[in-house]
Design a protein with these regions (language model features):
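Acidic, serine/threonine-rich low-complexity disordered tracts
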Residues: 13-88, 92-105, 117, 122-224
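Bacterial N-terminal signal peptides that target proteins for export
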Residues: 1-2
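C-terminal motif of bacterial Sec signal peptides marking the signal peptidase cleavage site
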Residues: 8-11
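Solvent-exposed, flexible loop/coil residues
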Residues: 112
């Protein structure tokens, strides 16, 4: 993290307690401990949490540090207790830091369509991204967003629970053309969380073999 980011990490708060306290508590309970610890972690209702699952790694919880206003949609900045940062805009990853493979920046020449405005036949958008540690810049993707009648065929704790909800709407992003190696489809579940319509779950791949599953946590709103 940069010095400025570290300053934000230790000073930002969603409630009365500093964010560093929430992160320290999560680090002690969860990180490198796996799914069972995530399930039993004691969460602070002053904060918002994001569960992150990566194949071959223990589950982790991230804390929402702050929301950065942006003309194309607010950017949520999520922190782990061990230094990773994920930035999310309208459900899509727009930057990461501290991962084994990072998308340092994602740019949209024009704003991707709102989820509720995606037509049945789908809609295209363009994306440019920078990738580290390979030092690859301005990778361009042409992406097709379509509604999906069902969720993904793979099963996780998050997708199984969401599959039973009659209110969830599924979408997928397919890269039809790219200046880099193709990526697997990205999946998004749209629903209401804490009274606000939002992406509650997604599976997004930063490479063909490095995929992140992001789930707002706890999934059951009354659990916190």
């Amino acid at each position: 993290l940069t010095a400025a980011s570290c300053t934000l990490l230790w000073s930002c708060a969603a409630g009365n307690a500093p964010l560093s306290d929430a992160l320290s508590a999560l680090t002690a309970q969860v990180f490198a401990s796996g799914d069972a610890s995530v399930q039993s972690a004691r969460l602070d209702s002053n904060y918002r949490y994001l569960r992150v699952d990566v194949d071959g790694h223990p589950s982790a919880l991230l804390v929402l540090g702050y929301v950065d206003p942006h003309p194309q949609g607010d950017i949520e900045v999520w922190y782990s207790g061990t230094g990773e940062v994920i930035r999310i805009q309208n459900g899509r990853i727009v930057a990461t830091s501290g991962l084994s493979l990072d998308w340092r920046a994602v740019r949209f020449p024009s704003t991707p369509p709102a989820w509720t405005a995606v037509p049945p036949q789908g809609v295209f958008y363009q994306r440019s991204r920078d990738e580290m540690p390979e030092h690859r810049y301005a990778i361009t993707d042409s992406v097709l967003t379509t509604p999906a009648p069902l969720g993904p065929t793979f099963s996780t704790a998050g997708t199984l629970a969401l599959a039973q909800s009659p209110t969830v709407r599924w979408f997928r992003d397919d890269i039809l053309n790219s200046s880099a190696a193709p990526l697997p489809p990205a999946w998004f579940a749209w629903d209401t969380y804490r009274g606000q319509p939002t992406v509650v779950y997604s599976r997004q791949c930063l490479s063909a073999t490095f995929c992140l599953q992001l789930l707002r946590w706890p999934l059951q709103e009354g659990a916190l």
